[in-house]
A protein has these predicted regions:
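Beta/alpha (TIM)-barrel catalytic core signal, keyed to glycine-rich beta->alpha loops juxtaposed to Asp/Glu
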Residues: 8-9, 104, 120-187
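Short helix-capping segments at alpha-helix termini
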Residues: 44-54, 110-112, 138-143, 163-167
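Short, well-ordered amphipathic alpha-helices
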Residues: 36-47, 103-107, 135, 157
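N-terminal binding-site loop/beta-alpha segment at the start of enzyme catalytic domains
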Residues: 1-60, 66, 70-76, 140
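Glycine-rich, positively charged active-site loop/lid region within alpha/beta enzyme cores that binds
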Residues: 70-90, 178-187
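Hydrophobic faces of well-ordered beta-strands that scaffold small-molecule active sites
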Residues: 1-2, 26, 56-60, 115-120, ...
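CE4/NodB-like, metal-dependent polysaccharide N-deacetylase domain
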Residues: 97-119
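Active-site mouth loops of central-metabolism enzymes
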Residues: 2-9, 64, 81-97, 126
Length: 187
């Protein structure tokens, strides 16, 4: 169940209906800004419907926080973090510190001590390899059971392989009759 753009009572109501219909995979992202509400909704379901944490497969994504430059509809957003021009990224440990903070916030907001799947929301060009390497470390530490990527093309997966990094366990991407993504599926 995708949770964007659901918040507060609407999110709880949808989640209760979805749970009663058998939904168990819940998908969110830190830049949907609904992880706290989702945690409260899950807490409600645990207490009111007798569900357990283990009943759900929780997915979240590590994302950049965007701020608009000019007309956002023209695709002129720029990220706060994962750009070389960002002042935040000048520290040599910036990627590690940001990812550790993001996963810890996600776990706290969702009221859980682990995530079933953590995805990199986009292949951020300036820090793609570094982000993935830090995600591998967080996976090894046991905070997440699986790691993956979103919206990656073959060239991104080859870059990981060529650097000796692990291949993502999941690559979430859009596919439809009009947008078949045959190359990535074949890969």
């Amino acid at each position: 169940l995708g949770t964007y753009p659901l918040y507060a009572k609407q999110l709880t109501d949808v989640l209760v209906m979805a749970y009663e219909e058998g939904y168990r995979l819940i998908d969110t992202a830190d830049n949907y800004y609904n992880e706290k509400d989702l945690g409260e909704s899950l807490y409600y379901i645990y207490n009111q419907l007798g569900a357990k944490r283990e009943d759900f497969f929780l997915v979240s994504k590590v994302s950049d926080e965007l701020y608009p430059i000019g007309d956002y509809r023209a695709g002129s957003n720029r990220g706060v973090y994962f750009w070389k021009s960002s002042r935040i990224m000048q520290s040599p440990n910036a990627v590690r510190e940001i990812l550790e903070e993001k996963i810890d916030n996600t776990l706290r907001f969702l009221k859980t001590d682990y995530l079933d799947l953590w995805l990199m929301h986009w292949p951020y060009p300036d820090f793609f390899l570094e982000i993935w390497h830090e995600m591998e470390k967080i996976y090894a530490a046991g905070k997440v059971k699986a790691i993956g990527v979103c919206n990656c093309r073959v060239r991104h997966l080859k870059a990981l392989r060529d650097q000796g990094l692990s291949i993502p366990m999941v690559n979430q991407f859009e596919s439809s009759p009009l947008n078949t993504k045959e190359e990535i599926i074949d890969y």
